[in-house]
Curated annotation (Swiss-Prot):
Source organism (scientific name): Actinobacillus pleuropneumoniae serotype 7 (strain AP76)
GO CC terms of this entry: cytoplasm
GO molecular function, one term: urease activity
EC number, UniProt record: 3.5.1.5
Reactions catalysed: urea + 2 H2O + H(+) = hydrogencarbonate + 2 NH4(+)
InterPro entries: Amidohydro-rel (IPR006680), Metal-dep_hydrolase_composite (IPR011059), Metal_Hydrolase (IPR032466), Urease_alpha_N_dom (IPR011612), Urease_alpha_subunit (IPR050112), Urease_AS (IPR017950), Urease_asu (IPR005848), Urease_asu_c (IPR017951)
A GO BP entry: urea catabolic process
Assembly information from the UniProt record: Heterotrimer of UreA (gamma), UreB (beta) and UreC (alpha) subunits. Three heterotrimers associate to form the active enzyme.
Subcellular location: Cytoplasm
Cofactor note: Binds 2 nickel ions per subunit.
Family listed: Belongs to the metallo-dependent hydrolases superfamily. Urease alpha subunit family.
Protein name: Urease subunit alpha
Enzyme class name: hydrolase
PTM annotation, UniProt: Carboxylation allows a single lysine to coordinate two nickel ions.
Length: 572
Protein backbone atom coordinates (compact mmCIF):
# COMPACT_ATOMS: atom_id res chain seq x y z
CA UNK A 1 0.00 0.00 0.00
CA UNK A 2 1.44 3.35 -1.04
CA UNK A 3 1.94 6.12 1.48
CA UNK A 4 1.23 9.66 0.36
CA UNK A 5 3.12 12.45 2.13
CA UNK A 6 3.11 16.22 1.60
CA UNK A 7 5.71 17.57 -0.81
CA UNK A 8 7.23 19.63 2.00
CA UNK A 9 7.79 16.49 4.06
CA UNK A 10 9.31 14.67 1.09
CA UNK A 11 11.71 17.53 0.40
CA UNK A 12 12.68 17.73 4.07
CA UNK A 13 13.50 14.01 4.06
CA UNK A 14 14.93 13.33 0.59
CA UNK A 15 15.60 16.74 -0.88
CA UNK A 16 13.93 18.52 -3.80
CA UNK A 17 12.45 16.66 -6.76
CA UNK A 18 11.06 17.48 -10.22
CA UNK A 19 9.60 20.98 -10.37
CA UNK A 20 11.15 22.21 -7.13
CA UNK A 21 13.18 25.40 -7.35
CA UNK A 22 16.46 25.90 -5.51
CA UNK A 23 18.11 29.28 -5.05
CA UNK A 24 21.85 29.39 -5.65
CA UNK A 25 23.53 31.19 -2.77
CA UNK A 26 22.23 34.73 -2.32
CA UNK A 27 21.99 35.27 -6.07
CA UNK A 28 18.70 35.67 -7.91
CA UNK A 29 19.40 32.48 -9.87
CA UNK A 30 16.84 29.68 -9.42
CA UNK A 31 17.48 26.12 -10.56
CA UNK A 32 14.55 23.78 -11.21
CA UNK A 33 15.05 20.01 -11.18
CA UNK A 34 14.25 18.69 -14.66
CA UNK A 35 14.36 14.93 -14.05
CA UNK A 36 14.45 12.60 -11.02
CA UNK A 37 16.07 9.18 -11.48
CA UNK A 38 14.98 7.85 -8.08
CA UNK A 39 12.09 5.50 -7.38
CA UNK A 40 9.71 6.99 -4.83
CA UNK A 41 9.64 4.81 -1.76
CA UNK A 42 13.00 3.22 -2.55
CA UNK A 43 15.28 6.18 -1.85
CA UNK A 44 18.54 5.33 -0.12
CA UNK A 45 19.22 7.18 3.08
CA UNK A 46 21.89 6.39 5.64
CA UNK A 47 21.50 6.86 9.41
CA UNK A 48 19.68 5.62 12.46
CA UNK A 49 16.36 4.13 11.44
CA UNK A 50 17.07 4.78 7.77
CA UNK A 51 17.12 2.47 4.76
CA UNK A 52 20.80 1.78 4.01
CA UNK A 53 21.09 -1.28 6.27
CA UNK A 54 21.99 -4.89 5.78
CA UNK A 55 19.22 -6.65 3.87
CA UNK A 56 17.38 -3.43 3.11
CA UNK A 57 19.03 -0.91 0.73
CA UNK A 58 22.37 -2.63 1.35
CA UNK A 59 22.97 -6.03 -0.19
CA UNK A 60 23.84 -8.87 2.19
CA UNK A 61 25.56 -10.95 -0.46
CA UNK A 62 27.38 -8.69 -2.91
CA UNK A 63 31.14 -8.56 -2.41
CA UNK A 64 33.54 -6.14 -4.01
CA UNK A 65 34.61 -8.87 -6.39
CA UNK A 66 31.29 -8.13 -8.06
CA UNK A 67 32.13 -5.29 -10.51
CA UNK A 68 28.66 -3.79 -9.97
CA UNK A 69 29.30 -3.02 -6.29
CA UNK A 70 30.11 0.63 -5.54
CA UNK A 71 32.98 2.01 -3.49
CA UNK A 72 31.01 5.19 -2.75
CA UNK A 73 27.35 6.12 -3.17
CA UNK A 74 26.26 9.74 -3.07
CA UNK A 75 22.51 9.50 -2.60
CA UNK A 76 19.53 11.75 -3.36
CA UNK A 77 21.71 14.57 -4.62
CA UNK A 78 20.76 17.44 -6.89
CA UNK A 79 23.15 17.64 -9.84
CA UNK A 80 23.95 20.79 -11.80
CA UNK A 81 25.96 19.86 -14.86
CA UNK A 82 26.48 21.36 -18.29
CA UNK A 83 26.01 17.99 -20.01
CA UNK A 84 23.60 16.11 -17.70
CA UNK A 85 21.39 19.09 -16.95
CA UNK A 86 19.77 19.85 -13.60
CA UNK A 87 18.64 16.51 -12.21
CA UNK A 88 18.14 14.45 -9.05
CA UNK A 89 19.93 11.10 -8.75
CA UNK A 90 22.32 8.90 -6.86
CA UNK A 91 25.94 9.02 -8.03
CA UNK A 92 27.85 5.74 -8.03
CA UNK A 93 31.65 5.68 -7.81
CA UNK A 94 34.04 2.79 -8.24
CA UNK A 95 37.82 2.76 -8.70
CA UNK A 96 37.90 6.55 -8.67
CA UNK A 97 35.48 6.99 -11.57
CA UNK A 98 31.80 7.73 -11.93
CA UNK A 99 30.12 4.47 -12.95
CA UNK A 100 26.47 5.40 -12.63
CA UNK A 101 23.97 8.25 -12.44
CA UNK A 102 20.71 6.68 -11.37
CA UNK A 103 19.30 4.63 -8.48
CA UNK A 104 21.72 2.97 -6.05
CA UNK A 105 20.71 0.24 -3.63
CA UNK A 106 20.01 -3.46 -3.22
CA UNK A 107 18.40 -5.15 -6.25
CA UNK A 108 17.30 -8.04 -4.02
CA UNK A 109 14.86 -5.82 -2.13
CA UNK A 110 14.37 -2.73 -4.31
CA UNK A 111 12.90 -1.90 -7.70
CA UNK A 112 14.73 -0.13 -10.52
CA UNK A 113 18.24 -0.26 -9.07
CA UNK A 114 20.71 0.74 -11.76
CA UNK A 115 22.53 -2.53 -12.58
CA UNK A 116 26.04 -1.34 -11.71
CA UNK A 117 25.06 0.71 -8.63
CA UNK A 118 24.77 -1.94 -5.91
CA UNK A 119 25.36 -0.83 -2.33
CA UNK A 120 27.18 -3.52 -0.39
CA UNK A 121 29.23 -3.92 2.74
CA UNK A 122 32.19 -2.40 0.88
CA UNK A 123 30.30 0.80 -0.02
CA UNK A 124 30.71 4.14 1.74
CA UNK A 125 27.55 6.30 1.65
CA UNK A 126 26.93 10.03 1.95
CA UNK A 127 23.49 11.65 2.10
CA UNK A 128 23.21 14.28 -0.61
CA UNK A 129 19.55 15.10 -0.04
CA UNK A 130 20.13 18.79 0.66
CA UNK A 131 23.27 19.25 -1.37
CA UNK A 132 24.19 20.18 -4.94
CA UNK A 133 26.83 18.18 -6.80
CA UNK A 134 28.88 19.75 -9.57
CA UNK A 135 31.90 18.60 -11.53
CA UNK A 136 35.23 19.85 -10.25
CA UNK A 137 36.15 23.13 -11.87
CA UNK A 138 38.99 23.60 -14.37
CA UNK A 139 41.18 26.71 -14.34
CA UNK A 140 43.24 27.01 -17.53
CA UNK A 141 45.11 30.22 -16.68
CA UNK A 142 47.45 29.41 -13.81
CA UNK A 143 50.67 31.29 -13.17
CA UNK A 144 52.54 28.80 -10.99
CA UNK A 145 54.00 31.49 -8.75
CA UNK A 146 53.53 29.56 -5.51
CA UNK A 147 52.29 26.05 -4.67
CA UNK A 148 49.85 27.36 -2.06
CA UNK A 149 47.54 28.38 -4.91
CA UNK A 150 46.33 24.79 -5.14
CA UNK A 151 44.74 24.86 -1.70
CA UNK A 152 42.95 28.14 -2.37
CA UNK A 153 41.70 26.82 -5.71
CA UNK A 154 40.31 23.55 -4.37
CA UNK A 155 38.56 25.46 -1.58
CA UNK A 156 36.50 27.20 -4.29
CA UNK A 157 35.76 23.97 -6.13
CA UNK A 158 38.61 23.92 -8.67
CA UNK A 159 40.10 20.44 -9.07
CA UNK A 160 42.17 20.88 -12.26
CA UNK A 161 44.79 23.61 -12.75
CA UNK A 162 46.43 24.19 -16.13
CA UNK A 163 49.14 26.78 -16.66
CA UNK A 164 52.84 27.37 -16.42
CA UNK A 165 55.68 28.82 -14.44
CA UNK A 166 58.41 27.81 -12.05
CA UNK A 167 57.86 29.96 -8.97
CA UNK A 168 58.19 33.70 -8.25
CA UNK A 169 60.50 34.57 -11.15
CA UNK A 170 59.66 37.55 -13.35
CA UNK A 171 58.90 35.26 -16.28
CA UNK A 172 56.29 33.42 -14.22
CA UNK A 173 54.84 36.60 -12.72
CA UNK A 174 53.95 37.70 -16.23
CA UNK A 175 53.55 34.56 -18.35
CA UNK A 176 52.04 31.11 -17.87
CA UNK A 177 54.98 29.21 -19.34
CA UNK A 178 57.17 26.48 -17.87
CA UNK A 179 60.16 26.79 -20.21
CA UNK A 180 62.18 23.75 -21.17
CA UNK A 181 62.69 20.19 -19.96
CA UNK A 182 64.59 21.04 -16.77
CA UNK A 183 61.87 23.33 -15.45
CA UNK A 184 59.07 21.05 -16.62
CA UNK A 185 60.64 18.05 -14.86
CA UNK A 186 61.16 20.00 -11.63
CA UNK A 187 57.56 21.22 -11.67
CA UNK A 188 56.19 17.71 -12.06
CA UNK A 189 58.33 16.60 -9.13
CA UNK A 190 57.32 19.63 -7.05
CA UNK A 191 53.59 19.16 -7.59
CA UNK A 192 53.37 15.57 -6.35
CA UNK A 193 51.99 16.83 -3.03
CA UNK A 194 49.35 19.13 -4.52
CA UNK A 195 45.76 17.80 -4.31
CA UNK A 196 44.64 18.86 -7.81
CA UNK A 197 45.03 17.61 -11.37
CA UNK A 198 47.73 19.59 -13.15
CA UNK A 199 48.90 20.36 -16.67
CA UNK A 200 51.81 22.55 -17.75
CA UNK A 201 52.23 24.85 -20.75
CA UNK A 202 55.63 24.95 -22.37
CA UNK A 203 56.97 28.27 -23.64
CA UNK A 204 55.49 28.67 -27.10
CA UNK A 205 57.49 31.74 -28.06
CA UNK A 206 59.95 30.40 -30.59
CA UNK A 207 59.94 30.73 -34.37
CA UNK A 208 61.75 27.42 -34.86
CA UNK A 209 60.04 24.07 -34.31
CA UNK A 210 62.53 21.88 -32.45
CA UNK A 211 62.74 23.97 -29.24
CA UNK A 212 58.94 23.72 -29.05
CA UNK A 213 58.74 20.01 -29.79
CA UNK A 214 61.21 19.10 -27.06
CA UNK A 215 58.99 20.79 -24.47
CA UNK A 216 55.97 18.79 -25.59
CA UNK A 217 57.99 15.58 -25.37
CA UNK A 218 59.09 16.68 -21.88
CA UNK A 219 55.47 16.69 -20.71
CA UNK A 220 53.85 19.98 -21.69
CA UNK A 221 50.16 19.47 -22.45
CA UNK A 222 50.24 22.56 -24.65
CA UNK A 223 52.17 25.68 -25.61
CA UNK A 224 51.60 29.22 -24.37
CA UNK A 225 52.42 32.26 -26.49
CA UNK A 226 52.78 35.50 -24.53
CA UNK A 227 53.44 39.01 -25.77
CA UNK A 228 56.12 39.59 -23.12
CA UNK A 229 58.23 36.97 -24.94
CA UNK A 230 57.16 38.33 -28.35
CA UNK A 231 53.84 37.18 -29.88
CA UNK A 232 54.92 37.59 -33.50
CA UNK A 233 53.30 35.98 -36.55
CA UNK A 234 56.34 33.71 -36.96
CA UNK A 235 56.02 32.52 -33.36
CA UNK A 236 52.29 31.91 -33.74
CA UNK A 237 52.76 29.90 -36.92
CA UNK A 238 55.54 27.77 -35.44
CA UNK A 239 53.62 26.96 -32.26
CA UNK A 240 50.53 25.97 -34.22
CA UNK A 241 52.56 23.77 -36.57
CA UNK A 242 53.94 21.86 -33.58
CA UNK A 243 50.49 21.69 -31.99
CA UNK A 244 48.96 20.26 -35.15
CA UNK A 245 51.71 17.66 -35.41
CA UNK A 246 51.67 16.61 -31.74
CA UNK A 247 47.97 17.09 -30.84
CA UNK A 248 48.28 19.72 -28.14
CA UNK A 249 46.57 23.06 -27.65
CA UNK A 250 48.05 26.55 -28.06
CA UNK A 251 47.02 29.33 -25.71
CA UNK A 252 47.80 32.92 -26.61
CA UNK A 253 48.14 36.32 -24.97
CA UNK A 254 48.34 38.56 -28.01
CA UNK A 255 50.30 41.71 -28.79
CA UNK A 256 48.83 44.66 -26.82
CA UNK A 257 51.26 47.15 -28.34
CA UNK A 258 50.56 45.95 -31.89
CA UNK A 259 54.34 45.85 -32.37
CA UNK A 260 54.43 43.10 -34.96
CA UNK A 261 50.97 43.58 -36.39
CA UNK A 262 47.34 44.13 -35.54
CA UNK A 263 44.57 41.68 -34.72
CA UNK A 264 44.07 41.01 -38.41
CA UNK A 265 47.73 40.01 -38.75
CA UNK A 266 47.46 37.65 -35.79
CA UNK A 267 44.35 36.03 -37.25
CA UNK A 268 46.15 35.69 -40.59
CA UNK A 269 49.05 33.93 -38.83
CA UNK A 270 46.62 31.64 -37.01
CA UNK A 271 45.16 30.83 -40.43
CA UNK A 272 41.99 29.08 -39.27
CA UNK A 273 43.75 26.74 -36.84
CA UNK A 274 42.18 26.24 -33.43
CA UNK A 275 43.60 28.38 -30.62
CA UNK A 276 42.62 29.27 -27.04
CA UNK A 277 42.68 33.05 -26.52
CA UNK A 278 43.30 34.25 -22.97
CA UNK A 279 41.48 37.28 -21.46
CA UNK A 280 39.89 37.93 -24.84
CA UNK A 281 38.41 41.25 -23.69
CA UNK A 282 41.91 42.71 -23.42
CA UNK A 283 42.35 44.10 -19.91
CA UNK A 284 44.63 41.16 -19.18
CA UNK A 285 46.47 41.82 -22.43
CA UNK A 286 45.99 41.55 -26.16
CA UNK A 287 45.68 43.72 -29.26
CA UNK A 288 44.43 47.15 -28.15
CA UNK A 289 41.65 48.07 -28.48
CA UNK A 290 39.97 45.30 -30.48
CA UNK A 291 41.21 41.88 -29.32
CA UNK A 292 37.61 41.25 -28.23
CA UNK A 293 36.78 40.74 -31.93
CA UNK A 294 38.68 37.44 -31.84
CA UNK A 295 35.66 35.88 -30.12
CA UNK A 296 33.68 35.91 -33.37
CA UNK A 297 35.92 33.42 -35.18
CA UNK A 298 34.88 29.74 -35.32
CA UNK A 299 38.43 28.50 -34.63
CA UNK A 300 38.92 30.69 -31.54
CA UNK A 301 38.11 29.35 -28.06
CA UNK A 302 37.70 32.61 -26.13
CA UNK A 303 38.28 32.88 -22.38
CA UNK A 304 38.03 35.52 -19.69
CA UNK A 305 40.10 35.96 -16.57
CA UNK A 306 38.27 36.75 -13.36
CA UNK A 307 39.45 40.27 -12.36
CA UNK A 308 37.08 41.81 -14.93
CA UNK A 309 34.24 39.48 -13.89
CA UNK A 310 31.77 41.04 -13.44
CA UNK A 311 32.17 44.72 -14.35
CA UNK A 312 31.83 46.73 -11.13
CA UNK A 313 32.52 50.27 -9.94
CA UNK A 314 35.93 49.14 -8.64
CA UNK A 315 37.16 47.25 -11.71
CA UNK A 316 39.03 50.03 -13.52
CA UNK A 317 40.96 51.45 -10.56
CA UNK A 318 42.06 48.01 -9.40
CA UNK A 319 43.36 46.99 -12.80
CA UNK A 320 45.82 49.83 -13.29
CA UNK A 321 47.81 48.96 -10.17
CA UNK A 322 47.67 45.23 -10.89
CA UNK A 323 49.00 45.74 -14.38
CA UNK A 324 52.02 47.78 -13.28
CA UNK A 325 53.10 45.04 -10.87
CA UNK A 326 52.45 41.99 -13.02
CA UNK A 327 54.17 43.21 -16.18
CA UNK A 328 57.19 44.84 -14.62
CA UNK A 329 56.12 48.38 -15.54
CA UNK A 330 57.29 51.66 -14.03
CA UNK A 331 54.89 54.51 -13.23
CA UNK A 332 57.76 56.94 -13.85
CA UNK A 333 58.05 55.86 -17.49
CA UNK A 334 55.39 57.55 -19.67
CA UNK A 335 55.42 54.72 -22.20
CA UNK A 336 54.70 52.18 -19.46
CA UNK A 337 51.77 54.25 -18.19
CA UNK A 338 50.41 54.57 -21.73
CA UNK A 339 50.75 50.81 -22.16
CA UNK A 340 48.69 50.26 -19.01
CA UNK A 341 46.04 52.79 -19.98
CA UNK A 342 45.61 51.22 -23.41
CA UNK A 343 44.61 47.89 -21.87
CA UNK A 344 42.01 49.08 -19.36
CA UNK A 345 38.83 50.08 -21.23
CA UNK A 346 35.46 50.34 -19.45
CA UNK A 347 33.63 49.97 -22.75
CA UNK A 348 35.08 46.58 -23.64
CA UNK A 349 34.86 45.28 -20.07
CA UNK A 350 31.14 46.15 -20.03
CA UNK A 351 30.70 44.36 -23.35
CA UNK A 352 32.47 41.30 -21.92
CA UNK A 353 29.64 40.82 -19.42
CA UNK A 354 27.09 40.70 -22.21
CA UNK A 355 29.19 38.51 -24.50
CA UNK A 356 29.36 35.94 -21.71
CA UNK A 357 25.60 36.06 -21.31
CA UNK A 358 25.14 35.61 -25.06
CA UNK A 359 27.39 32.55 -25.10
CA UNK A 360 30.04 34.28 -27.21
CA UNK A 361 32.75 34.09 -24.55
CA UNK A 362 33.05 30.44 -23.58
CA UNK A 363 35.55 29.93 -20.74
CA UNK A 364 36.30 31.42 -17.29
CA UNK A 365 39.73 31.28 -15.66
CA UNK A 366 41.74 33.08 -12.99
CA UNK A 367 45.12 34.48 -14.12
CA UNK A 368 46.31 33.49 -10.66
CA UNK A 369 48.45 36.07 -8.80
CA UNK A 370 49.04 37.79 -12.14
CA UNK A 371 45.95 40.01 -12.32
CA UNK A 372 43.56 37.30 -11.14
CA UNK A 373 42.44 35.44 -8.03
CA UNK A 374 42.85 31.68 -8.03
CA UNK A 375 40.20 31.08 -5.37
CA UNK A 376 37.43 33.08 -7.06
CA UNK A 377 36.84 31.52 -10.49
CA UNK A 378 33.60 29.83 -9.46
CA UNK A 379 32.38 32.79 -7.42
CA UNK A 380 33.06 35.37 -10.14
CA UNK A 381 31.27 33.22 -12.71
CA UNK A 382 28.04 33.20 -10.72
CA UNK A 383 28.34 36.88 -9.85
CA UNK A 384 28.46 37.60 -13.57
CA UNK A 385 25.43 35.40 -14.21
CA UNK A 386 23.46 37.16 -11.47
CA UNK A 387 24.43 40.62 -12.75
CA UNK A 388 23.32 39.72 -16.25
CA UNK A 389 19.96 38.44 -15.04
CA UNK A 390 19.43 41.70 -13.17
CA UNK A 391 20.42 43.83 -16.16
CA UNK A 392 19.21 41.73 -19.11
CA UNK A 393 16.36 39.69 -17.67
CA UNK A 394 15.64 36.00 -18.04
CA UNK A 395 17.09 33.85 -20.82
CA UNK A 396 14.07 32.06 -22.27
CA UNK A 397 10.60 31.68 -20.82
CA UNK A 398 10.92 28.52 -18.72
CA UNK A 399 10.07 30.25 -15.44
CA UNK A 400 13.49 29.37 -14.07
CA UNK A 401 17.15 30.11 -14.78
CA UNK A 402 18.16 26.62 -15.89
CA UNK A 403 19.52 27.59 -19.28
CA UNK A 404 21.57 30.47 -17.91
CA UNK A 405 22.87 28.23 -15.11
CA UNK A 406 23.95 25.53 -17.57
CA UNK A 407 25.57 28.14 -19.81
CA UNK A 408 27.63 29.55 -16.96
CA UNK A 409 28.66 26.30 -15.30
CA UNK A 410 29.95 25.11 -18.67
CA UNK A 411 32.43 28.00 -18.67
CA UNK A 412 34.57 26.52 -15.89
CA UNK A 413 33.86 22.80 -16.31
CA UNK A 414 33.26 21.15 -19.68
CA UNK A 415 34.42 23.93 -22.02
CA UNK A 416 37.98 24.29 -20.70
CA UNK A 417 38.14 20.49 -20.71
CA UNK A 418 37.15 20.39 -24.38
CA UNK A 419 39.60 23.17 -25.22
CA UNK A 420 42.54 21.23 -23.80
CA UNK A 421 41.70 17.69 -24.83
CA UNK A 422 40.78 16.39 -21.37
CA UNK A 423 36.98 16.18 -21.65
CA UNK A 424 37.15 12.38 -21.74
CA UNK A 425 38.50 12.54 -18.17
CA UNK A 426 36.97 15.59 -16.46
CA UNK A 427 34.59 18.50 -16.99
CA UNK A 428 31.26 16.85 -16.22
CA UNK A 429 29.68 14.18 -14.05
CA UNK A 430 29.11 11.82 -16.97
CA UNK A 431 29.69 8.11 -16.50
CA UNK A 432 33.28 7.06 -17.09
CA UNK A 433 34.94 10.27 -15.95
CA UNK A 434 37.10 10.83 -12.89
CA UNK A 435 34.99 11.25 -9.76
CA UNK A 436 36.12 14.82 -9.14
CA UNK A 437 32.97 16.05 -7.42
CA UNK A 438 32.20 19.24 -5.50
CA UNK A 439 29.34 19.25 -2.99
CA UNK A 440 27.62 22.46 -1.97
CA UNK A 441 24.87 23.47 0.40
CA UNK A 442 22.54 25.58 -1.76
CA UNK A 443 22.96 28.63 0.48
CA UNK A 444 26.75 28.45 0.00
CA UNK A 445 26.71 27.53 -3.69
CA UNK A 446 29.52 29.13 -5.65
CA UNK A 447 31.34 30.31 -2.55
CA UNK A 448 32.17 27.59 -0.04
CA UNK A 449 31.80 23.87 -0.82
CA UNK A 450 30.99 21.33 1.87
CA UNK A 451 33.68 19.03 0.58
CA UNK A 452 35.61 18.18 -2.56
CA UNK A 453 36.20 14.64 -3.81
CA UNK A 454 39.17 13.70 -5.97
CA UNK A 455 38.85 10.42 -7.84
CA UNK A 456 36.12 9.30 -5.47
CA UNK A 457 37.92 10.09 -2.21
CA UNK A 458 37.32 13.14 -0.01
CA UNK A 459 40.27 15.51 -0.40
CA UNK A 460 39.26 18.83 1.21
CA UNK A 461 36.36 19.71 3.49
CA UNK A 462 34.99 22.27 5.88
CA UNK A 463 35.91 20.82 9.23
CA UNK A 464 35.43 21.90 12.81
CA UNK A 465 37.69 21.55 15.82
CA UNK A 466 39.46 18.16 15.56
CA UNK A 467 39.48 17.93 19.38
CA UNK A 468 35.72 18.44 19.65
CA UNK A 469 33.25 15.68 20.46
CA UNK A 470 31.47 16.13 17.10
CA UNK A 471 32.73 17.43 13.71
CA UNK A 472 30.88 20.76 13.69
CA UNK A 473 32.15 23.02 16.53
CA UNK A 474 34.02 26.20 15.67
CA UNK A 475 36.48 27.07 14.34
CA UNK A 476 35.23 25.61 11.06
CA UNK A 477 37.53 26.12 8.12
CA UNK A 478 38.92 24.17 5.19
CA UNK A 479 41.32 21.43 6.07
CA UNK A 480 43.02 18.76 3.95
CA UNK A 481 41.35 15.38 4.39
CA UNK A 482 42.77 11.88 3.95
CA UNK A 483 42.50 12.12 0.17
CA UNK A 484 45.06 14.94 0.23
CA UNK A 485 47.51 13.04 2.43
CA UNK A 486 50.53 10.89 1.67
CA UNK A 487 50.19 8.28 -1.08
CA UNK A 488 46.41 8.75 -1.23
CA UNK A 489 47.08 12.19 -2.67
CA UNK A 490 49.18 10.85 -5.54
CA UNK A 491 46.49 8.25 -6.24
CA UNK A 492 43.71 10.88 -6.18
CA UNK A 493 45.12 13.42 -8.64
CA UNK A 494 46.61 13.16 -12.13
CA UNK A 495 48.91 14.98 -14.52
CA UNK A 496 47.57 15.88 -17.96
CA UNK A 497 50.39 15.60 -20.49
CA UNK A 498 51.07 15.14 -24.19
CA UNK A 499 50.86 11.73 -25.81
CA UNK A 500 54.49 12.17 -26.86
CA UNK A 501 55.54 12.42 -23.22
CA UNK A 502 53.53 9.32 -22.29
CA UNK A 503 55.32 7.49 -25.10
CA UNK A 504 58.63 8.78 -23.69
CA UNK A 505 57.64 7.44 -20.24
CA UNK A 506 58.28 10.66 -18.33
CA UNK A 507 56.63 9.10 -15.28
CA UNK A 508 59.59 6.76 -14.91
CA UNK A 509 62.13 9.33 -16.11
CA UNK A 510 61.09 11.90 -13.50
CA UNK A 511 60.29 9.44 -10.72
CA UNK A 512 56.77 10.78 -10.24
CA UNK A 513 53.90 8.80 -8.75
CA UNK A 514 50.77 10.49 -10.10
CA UNK A 515 49.08 8.97 -13.12
CA UNK A 516 49.87 10.67 -16.43
CA UNK A 517 46.92 10.98 -18.81
CA UNK A 518 47.41 12.11 -22.41
CA UNK A 519 45.40 14.95 -23.90
CA UNK A 520 43.53 14.00 -27.07
CA UNK A 521 41.67 15.72 -29.87
CA UNK A 522 43.01 19.22 -29.20
CA UNK A 523 43.24 20.06 -32.90
CA UNK A 524 39.84 18.73 -33.95
CA UNK A 525 37.70 21.08 -31.86
CA UNK A 526 36.23 24.47 -32.61
CA UNK A 527 33.88 27.02 -31.14
CA UNK A 528 30.96 24.87 -32.33
CA UNK A 529 31.97 22.16 -29.84
CA UNK A 530 31.81 24.38 -26.75
CA UNK A 531 28.71 23.60 -24.71
CA UNK A 532 26.05 26.34 -24.45
CA UNK A 533 28.71 28.91 -25.43
CA UNK A 534 29.30 28.59 -29.17
CA UNK A 535 27.89 31.80 -30.66
CA UNK A 536 29.93 33.49 -33.41
CA UNK A 537 28.25 36.83 -34.22
CA UNK A 538 30.04 39.65 -36.01
CA UNK A 539 31.84 41.89 -33.50
CA UNK A 540 33.18 45.38 -34.24
CA UNK A 541 34.99 47.91 -32.04
CA UNK A 542 35.06 51.67 -32.57
CA UNK A 543 38.81 52.50 -32.55
CA UNK A 544 38.30 55.88 -30.88
CA UNK A 545 35.37 55.39 -28.49
CA UNK A 546 35.91 51.63 -27.94
CA UNK A 547 32.19 50.95 -28.35
CA UNK A 548 31.51 47.28 -29.06
CA UNK A 549 28.82 46.21 -31.51
CA UNK A 550 27.44 42.72 -32.04
CA UNK A 551 25.78 42.23 -35.42
CA UNK A 552 25.56 46.01 -35.59
CA UNK A 553 23.96 46.52 -32.17
CA UNK A 554 25.86 48.50 -29.53
CA UNK A 555 26.25 46.39 -26.38
CA UNK A 556 27.06 47.87 -22.99
CA UNK A 557 25.96 47.73 -19.37
CA UNK A 558 26.38 49.65 -16.14
CA UNK A 559 28.99 48.62 -13.58
CA UNK A 560 27.56 46.85 -10.55
CA UNK A 561 27.62 48.65 -7.21
CA UNK A 562 26.87 45.45 -5.29
CA UNK A 563 27.34 41.76 -6.08
CA UNK A 564 26.08 38.56 -4.43
CA UNK A 565 28.34 35.88 -2.94
CA UNK A 566 30.47 38.60 -1.38
CA UNK A 567 30.69 40.20 2.08
CA UNK A 568 27.75 38.22 3.41
CA UNK A 569 30.02 35.15 3.25
CA UNK A 570 33.39 36.53 4.35
CA UNK A 571 34.80 38.31 7.38
CA UNK A 572 37.51 40.04 5.34
Amino acid sequence: MALTIPRSQYVATYGPTVGDKVRLGDTDLWATIEQDFLTKGDECKFGGGKSVRDGMAQSSTATRDNPNVLDFALTNVMIIDAKLGIIKADIGIRDGRIVGIGQAGNPDTMDNVTPNMIIGASTEVHNGAHLIATAGGIDTHIHWICPQQAQHAIENGITTMIGGGSGPADGTHATTCTPGKFNIERMFQACEALPVNIGFFGKGNCSMLEPLKEQVVAGALGLKIHEDWGATPAVIDAALKVADEMDVQVAIHTDTLNESGFLEDTMKAINGRVIHTFHTEGAGGGHAPDIIKAAMYPNVLPASTNPTRPFTVNTIDEHLDMLMVCHHLDKRVPEDVAFADSRIRPETIAAEDILHDMGVFSIMSSDSQAMGRVGEVVTRTWQTADKMKAQRGALGDEGNDNFRIKRYIAKYTINPAIAHGISQYVGSLEVGKLADIVLWKPQFFGVKPEFVMKKGFISFAKMGDPNASIPTPQPVFYRPMFGANAKANTESAVYFVSQASVDANIKAQYGIQKETLAVKGCRDVGKKDLVHNNATPEITVDPERYEVRVDGEHITCEPATKVPLAQRYFLF
